[in-house]
From Swiss-Prot:
Gene name linked to the record: rpsZ
Lineage, uppermost ranks: Bacteria, Thermotogati, Thermotogota, Thermotogae, Thermotogales
GO annotation (BP), single: translation
Record-given protein name: Small ribosomal subunit protein uS14
Source organism of this protein record: Fervidobacterium nodosum (strain ATCC 35602 / DSM 5306 / Rt17-B1)
Keywords carried by this UniProt record: Metal-binding, Ribonucleoprotein, Ribosomal protein, RNA-binding, rRNA-binding, Zinc
Residue sites binding Zn(2+) per the record: 24, 27, 40, 43
Record's function text: Binds 16S rRNA, required for the assembly of 30S particles and may also be responsible for determining the conformation of the 16S rRNA at the A site.
Family to which the UniProt record says this protein belongs: Belongs to the universal ribosomal protein uS14 family. Zinc-binding uS14 subfamily.
Amino acid sequence: MAKKSMVERWKKPKKFKVREYTRCSICGRVHSVYREFGICRVCFRKMANEGKLPGVRKASW
């Protein structure tokens, strides 16, 4: 989990639009963030397994 001061820092608008980047809304992770859900792959997997993401199911073929 990210420090509270860092979370507040990320929320502030950037001086230049180019400097903005996606972060996980739950843990603050920078890499592998799904834009559609706004969360990282780690949080996505955890929430999907708990059934907290509607319409998401485990693939089986």
